[in-house]
Curated annotation (Swiss-Prot):
It is found in: Cell membrane. This is Phosphate import ATP-binding protein PstB. The gene is pstB. SMART domains: AAA. Keywords: ATP-binding, Cell membrane, Membrane, Nucleotide-binding, Phosphate transport, Translocase, Transport. It is an enzyme of class 7 (translocase). The keyword Transport applies. PANTHER family: ABC TRANSPORTER I FAMILY MEMBER 17. SUPFAM superfamilies: P-loop containing nucleoside triphosphate hydrolases.
Amino acid sequence: MTSLLEIKDLTAFYGPLRAIKDVSLSIQEGSVTALIGPSGCGKSTLLRTLNRMHELSPGAKVKGQVLLDGRDLYQLDPVYVRQEVGMISQRPNPFPTMSIRENVLAGIKLNRKRIHRIQQNELMERCLRSVNLWDEVHNRLGRPGGELSGGQQQRLCIARAIAVSPRVILMDEPCSALDPVSTKAIEQLICKLKEKHTIVIVTHNMQQASRVSDWTAVFNVARSGGSGELVEHDKTEVIFTSPKNEVTLNYISGKFG
């Protein structure tokens, strides 16, 4: 297994505030990597640096490198980066007035990819089937995406993301606003998607991390300066059964968090 994303000595700022400090991490291709740790330790900030969404915040900047297949992410066209590295947010965010069909194809149109309508329909169906949504919506594709349930909306957002064939999918607590049944559906989908995509997921649910991920990176707030730092990174089984760092052990055992 090879590294698709290489994070090297990465420090991220929001103005004068340092959110994460000197993070180095390898993300393996075709795997699911979970980022866990207490609130405020920089997990979501790190995620946003991986497709350059971080830089859209006023005063934001980064030091260090993020390499995508050996190429410096911050030397590439940001539009290209966001095609290669998709993002799924905490709360489902379909375009509420767009139809289900239009939602799936939105990324294609935003990236100005011209494909025949027949091909569009084939792509839409393939993406909806990939997220196990086709059977639930195939007879109402013209209805607004905002009419779907929360779990269906999140799967629609994932269908929209995979329509542009990203190599990496970033997920920022994708189940935090969902009920247990919808959460289970998303977790099953994550395990399915890693066959074609590399996935990085932020989650506060340690049971979820243990269920869906191959690798886990543990973060904490540094005692000096209050910025987030990487504590430990290993195979998920190792993290949850025999962690090497006392901070990791204390976190997964519920002593803080």
